[in-house]
Regions:
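Sec/Tat signal peptide C-region and signal peptidase I cleavage site
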Residues: 14-18
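A mid-sequence, solvent-exposed acidic-amphipathic segment
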Residues: 186-235
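Generic recognition of well-structured, leucine-rich alpha-helical segments
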Residues: 11, 179-180
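Sec-dependent N-terminal signal peptides
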Residues: 4-13
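Transmembrane beta-barrel domains of Gram-negative outer membranes and organellar outer membranes
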Residues: 19-151, 156-163, 167-174, 180-187, ...
Length: 312
């Protein structure tokens, strides 16, 4: 609860700072157009630096299939993963202001921790502007809390889903997304902190990771996407899981963004089995080298929920 209050306070302070800087802006200064560094709210596994304007809401569906190849893939094992469902997420994200977004979602989850409910805030503190050297990049802060509503296993088993109480069912992510568009190419760097309230003995409650993402248009409506995360783990934690025959791999995704009239469709390939950062940062054990990557897609539709009267 203290962490949740800290996150809310953090966004309140940042929002107040943003309002103050707007007030003291010189009215005679030349106005520049905001640069749209990424087109969507998500790259593949990673969030993007973008936020929705005030009153705009998106409805999104993410779907991760089973392994394409490897021991659990191929024609005879689930027809290249299409017969299996690793994870599904359905969510909404709405612009409360032109900088602050609120999101809520439900994800199936993969592995031991399932039945996940997410809420989060996304605040864009800085915006890159076209032909303005004073605003060379965009910076967004994202924070969430995820609750697992699944039935807990026996606490004597000491598994990661052997929840002891309501508080132990939660995990939180705080992420800073920094991005810049160079001509047609968009690059993003996103360091991340993950805290999991309950972990099995030998695992780490606190993890740091760093991610990166790229976007490169191949045509007006067909775009190449890729993202990658590396999680920093202690050697003792690595040795603990290795003794149980578990090895971790960095999540990597590559895919295509297809922009259609009214919808944005992503066709992706990734070794991550979970959709939420709270899970794939901690527990990606699938390897591209062993064929343990999967088809995935994201479908997004934007709606106007309310209009900003000041913008008229």
């Amino acid at each position: 609860m203290k962490r949740l209050l800290f996150v809310v306070l953090l966004f309140t302070v940042i929002n107040s700072f943003g309002q103050e800087t707007t007030i003291i802006k010189t009215p005679t200064k030349q106005e520049f157009t905001n640069t749209k560094v990424f087109y969507s709210q998500k790259v593949i596994n990673s969030k993007s630096v973008e936020v929705h304007p005030k009153g705009i809401m998106d409805f999104s569906i993410d779907h991760y299939f089973g392994d394409i190849a490897g021991d659990n893939g191929g024609v005879r094992h689930g027809f290249f993963g299409l017969d299996a469902i690793k994870d599904v997420r359905i969510g909404f994200q709405i612009g409360l202001t032109d900088r602050l977004n609120f999101l809520i979602a439900r994800a199936k989850g993969s592995g031991f921790v399932t039945n996940q409910y997410e809420w989060g805030l996304k605040y864009q503190a800085l915006r890159q502007k076209d032909n303005d050297p004073g605003h060379p990049l965009s910076l967004t802060i994202f924070a969430n809390d995820v609750l697992s509503a699944m039935k807990a296993t026996d606490t004597a088993l000491h598994l990661e889903n052997s929840f002891e109480d309501f508080g132990s069912r939660h995990s939180q992510v705080v992420q800073v997304l920094v991005a810049r568009k160079f001509g047609k190419l968009s690059l993003q760097l996103n360091p991340l902190y993950l805290h999991t309230n309950y972990v099995e003995p030998g695992a780490e409650e606190d993890l740091f990771a760093v991610g990166g993402a790229i976007r490169l248009p191949l045509s007006k409506k067909f775009v190449l996407l890729a993202d990658y995360f590396h999680t920093f783990r202690s050697q003792s934690s690595i040795d603990f899981f290795a003794s149980k025959g578990i090895g971790f791999h960095d999540p990597f995704g590559i895919g295509f963004e297809i922009i259609t009239e009214g919808h944005v469709f992503h066709l992706n390939f990734t070794n991550a089995t979970d959709i939420l950062e709270n899970r794939f940062i901690r527990g990606t054990t699938s390897s591209w080298g062993d064929g343990e990557f999967r088809w995935a897609f994201t479908l997004t539709r934007n709606f106007v929920v309310f209009r900003d009267k000041k913008a008229k």
